[in-house]
Curated annotation (Swiss-Prot):
<dbReference type="Pfam" id="PF01795">
    <property type="entry name" value="Methyltransf_5"/>
</dbReference>
<dbReference type="InterPro" id="IPR029063">
    <property type="entry name" value="SAM-dependent_MTases_sf"/>
</dbReference>
<dbReference type="InterPro" id="IPR002903">
    <property type="entry name" value="RsmH"/>
</dbReference>
<keyword id="KW-0963">Cytoplasm</keyword>
<keyword id="KW-0949">S-adenosyl-L-methionine</keyword>
<protein>
    <recommendedName>
        <fullName>Ribosomal RNA small subunit methyltransferase H</fullName>
        <ecNumber>2.1.1.199</ecNumber>
    </recommendedName>
</protein>
<comment type="similarity">
    <text>Belongs to the methyltransferase superfamily. RsmH family.</text>
</comment>
<dbReference type="GO" id="GO:0005737">
    <property type="term" value="C:cytoplasm"/>
</dbReference>
<feature type="region of interest" description="Disordered">
    <location>
        <begin position="286"/>
        <end position="327"/>
    </location>
</feature>
<dbReference type="InterPro" id="IPR023397">
    <property type="entry name" value="SAM-dep_MeTrfase_MraW_recog"/>
</dbReference>
<feature type="binding site">
    <location>
        <position position="55"/>
    </location>
    <ligand>
        <name>S-adenosyl-L-methionine</name>
    </ligand>
</feature>
<comment type="function">
    <text>Specifically methylates the N4 position of cytidine in position 1402 (C1402) of 16S rRNA.</text>
</comment>
<keyword id="KW-0808">Transferase</keyword>
<dbReference type="GO" id="GO:0070475">
    <property type="term" value="P:rRNA base methylation"/>
</dbReference>
<dbReference type="GO" id="GO:0071424">
    <property type="term" value="F:rRNA (cytosine-N4-)-methyltransferase activity"/>
</dbReference>
<keyword id="KW-0698">rRNA processing</keyword>
<keyword id="KW-0489">Methyltransferase</keyword>
Length: 327
């Protein structure tokens, strides 16, 4: 397994975080540390910065710990899901941070390890848990959800047009034997989708696997809590960067942050009170894709969309100190 994978949009991430991380005593959070690629680049680019890395995947944490070991006491790695960031910062005694990075979705390591069950291109156990120490597996979902629940998962999280058809086939086939490995599911999806639909869009199982992964790991629910919590943790002039890999993630990030970028008063109010002014300034115009050059060098960048924002003010009634947190 390659543990020195190339992280996506590294130069752009560093460029966006640069103004915030050059401040004395700067702290940056890598909320999805994975194999440590972005973290390593940030620590090299900013020799004085302290990095707090989170990941729910203990295997990934061990790899990143080895990769970052030479950087010593500037690194804190925590086994945590990113919506637990407030608890992590409280435990570490960190009142605010200067930058937060999210690199969402499944990691290259998780895809490469057959036993994790994320890849539909190889027969493997239907696990798909990012944290293998807890939670139901993809097999549990397939073998226990009824038709309506499975349809909801496939439709909402996979945007699968043939969700009910696939769900019915799953419920019918599991009566003969429970689902345990990915190859059987791939075959079922292929057989459930009309031939015309199978001829475009890549592997027909792609959407089903995405939906199951999101359901197993509660990815969108966690992200909806995590992004506002991360923004709340920023000091004034702190910056947030999010790399998304499908439209569900990207739309959610935009939706939860957008209200902070506009005044919290009616649009026809002639004067905006100070406590109603926006607390967020967008640093990107919409969602930025990777360049053609980056995609040629790193295939994973083909689906990435980047959004970044800066905190421009504290919430009403709270004054943020860029180096000392809330005061």
């Amino acid at each position: 397994m390659d543990v020195t994978h190339t992280p996506v949009l590294t130069e752009r991430v560093i460029q966006l975080l640069d103004p915030a991380l050059r401040r004395p005593g700067a702290v940056v959070v890598d909320a999805t540390v994975g194999l440590g690629g972005h973290s390593h680049a940030l620590l090299e680019a900013f020799p004085q910065v302290r990095l707090i890395g989170l990941d729910r995947d203990t295997t990934a944490l061990e790899h990143s710990r080895r990769r970052l070991t030479g950087l010593g006491d500037r690194v804190d790695l925590e086994h945590a899901v990113y919506d637990q960031l407030p608890d992590v910062l409280d435990r570490l005694g960190v009142p605010s941070v200067d930058g937060v990075l999210f690199d969402l979705g499944v990691s290259s390591m998780q895809l490469d390890l057959d036993e994790r069950g994320f890849a539909y291109s190889r027969d493997a156990p239907l696990d798909m848990r990012m944290d293998q120490e807890r939670g139901p597996t993809a097999a549990d979902v397939l073998n226990n959800y009824d038709v309506d629940a499975l349809t909801r998962v496939l439709r909402e999280y996979g945007e699968e047009r043939f969700a009910r058809r696939i769900a019915r086939a799953v419920v019918t086939q599991r009566q003969a034997a429970p689902f345990t490995t990915s190859a059987r599911l791939v075959d079922l999806v292929r057989d459930s989708i009309p031939a015309a639909a199978r001829r475009t869009g890549g592997n027909p199982a792609k959407r089903t696997f995405q939906a199951l992964r999101i359901e197993v790991n509660s990815e969108l629910e966690v992200l909806e809590r995590a992004v506002p919590a991360a923004f709340d943790a920023l000091a004034v002039a702190g910056r947030l960067v999010v790399l998304s890999y499908h439209s569900l993630e990207d739309r959610l990030v935009k939706r939860v942050l957008m209200p902070r970028s506009v005044p919290s008063v009616p649009p026809d109010m002639p004067v905006i009170p100070d406590d109603a002014r926006p607390t967020l300034r967008w640093l990107t115009r919409g969602a930025e894709p990777a360049s053609d050059t980056e995609i040629e060098q790193n295939a994973r960048a083909g689906s990435v969309r980047l959004r970044a924002a800066e905190r421009t003010a504290a919430e009403p009634g709270r004054a943020h100190n860029p180096t000392g947190g809330v005061r």
